[in-house]
Amino acid sequence: MSNYCDRRINMLIKQVMEVFDLLDSAYVSGGEVKNYLQNKGDADITVKTIQDGTHSTDFIKIVISGKNGKTAGGSAPTLGIVGRLGGIGARPEVTGYVSDGDGALCALAVAAKLIEMKTKGDVLEGDVIVCTQLCPHAPTQPHEPVPFMGSPVDMATMNREEVDEAMEAILSIDTTKGNSIINVNGFAISQTVKEGYILRYSSDILDVMQRTTGKAPHTFGVSMQDITPYGNGVYHVNSILQPATATGAPVIGVAVTTEQPVAGCATGASHFVDVEETARFAMEVAKAFTAGKCSFYDQAEFHLLEKKYGKMSHLQTMGADI
């Protein structure tokens, strides 16, 4: 193993491997993942199956309560971690776990680690809510050389099930490899998006990224199109910022990336080093944010923008009929 791997495969690699073994199955269900997490320790876990024609998906929500979190009657901030994807598999067109599943893999690995930490006495100050979906038989769109990934549910349903009103800030983790915009193996973060405004990069989040990777932070820019809802007829790089259309909380996209474009339905394209690094970053953000030591945006500056230029929340809607 190279020095690169020796230095970076640590903290969450066990959880990543365990979760991957669960997800890499044509028969995996939300109930199976729930049982796995419950065996780790205390957490409030709910699973909801939604059927759409011949396809279905299991949405899973994990609430890991903090010692001073809202669920305990406290006042510490609540972080949301959303694992975004169309599906973890594209069967029968493609055999096995697909690259698009890395958002779920990251989010569930973080949940497993936080539950284990709590069992061992390391309890975060505030609550963490982890949401994702599991669909091993996601629909695809015919395309050469490989089919595109689809989803058994529409974006409105996905947002309704994965964006919880208790989330006071959200990390949206999504495989973002099928483009020529981000050209690095690992992960990259977006600017903060809040109520139609694309704000500057959070210096606190950049600091966490530098500390956990030991490297200069990688970022990617988002467009106005990316922060509008799916289905409005304009181009979106992917669904990574779609949670921002369904909440007033600040959202940061966390993109799992590669140097070269890779299709979401590609198999054998998930890199454990990159997934672990992304998950570890999200866990450290959870520690800092729920302790009140990490901000996603400058509140005073945001209010100044709204006073000077007005609200931009219309960008969270489908827009005018034309």
Give the ranges of each region predicted by the language model.
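Acidic, glycine-rich active-site loops and adjacent beta-strand->loop/helix elements
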Residues: 85-88, 132-139, 177
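Solvent-exposed alpha-helices and their adjacent loops that cap or buttress functional pockets
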Residues: 53-55, 68-75, 98-100, 120-124, ...
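Conserved active-site and cofactor/substrate-binding residues in soluble primary-metabolism enzymes
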Residues: 28-32, 54-57, 76, 102-105, ...
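A glycine-rich helix N-cap at a beta->alpha junction
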Residues: 146-171
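Soluble metallo-hydrolase cores and metallopeptidase-like ectodomains found primarily
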Residues: 14-91
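Short acidic, glycine/serine/threonine-rich loops at helix termini
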Residues: 93, 139-146, 182-185, 266
